[in-house]
UniProtKB/Swiss-Prot annotation:
The keyword Iron is assigned to this record: no
NCBIfam families: L21
GO biological process: translation
Gene that encodes the chain: rplU
Pfam families reported in the protein's UniProt record: Ribosomal_L21p (PF00829)
UniProt name for this protein: Large ribosomal subunit protein bL21
Listed HAMAP family: Ribosomal_bL21 (MF_01363)
Quaternary structure and partners: Part of the 50S ribosomal subunit. Contacts protein L20.
Molecular functions (GO terms): rRNA binding; structural constituent of ribosome
Keywords: Ribonucleoprotein, Ribosomal protein, RNA-binding, rRNA-binding
Lineage, opening ranks: Bacteria, Pseudomonadati, Pseudomonadota, Gammaproteobacteria, Pasteurellales
GO cellular component, as recorded: cytoplasm; ribonucleoprotein complex; ribosome
InterPro entries, per the entry: bL21-like, bL21-like_sf, Ribosomal_bL21, Ribosomal_bL21_CS
Similarity annotation: Belongs to the bacterial ribosomal protein bL21 family.
């Protein structure tokens, strides 16, 4: 059984027991989170596709950790001008473990 849900402007395909990195959520570590915007649920041959969301669909997860991703380097370089600009960015994320899928 797996589900596709939306969080942080992105869609994630998950199954129970899976650990997923999402955009940062303002929830403490160890707390439960419920995602109501379930777009699709598949249980064997039974496929439920939402228009746009599945009625009564819910993905329940537990927050495992918060952190920051790998550094992305942004470089702006102008040739022949002796000009260079560097910048870095590390995006915050929340790691959750999927504990239940309901349809």
């Amino acid at each position: 059984m797996y589900a596709v849900f939306q969080s942080g402007g992105k869609q994630h395909r998950v199954s129970e027991g899976q650990v997923v990195r999402l955009e940062k959520l303002e929830v403490a570590t160890g707390e439960k989170v419920e995602f109501d915007s379930v777009l699709m649920v598949v249980n064997g041959e039974d496929v439920k596709i939402g228009t746009p969301v599945v009625a009564g669909g819910k993905v329940v997860a537990e927050v495992v950790a918060h952190g920051r991703g790998e550094k992305v380097r942004i470089v702006k370089f102008r040739r022949r001008k002796h000009s260079r600009k560097q910048q870095g960015h590390r995006q915050w994320f929340t790691e959750v473990k999927i504990t239940g899928i309901q349809a």
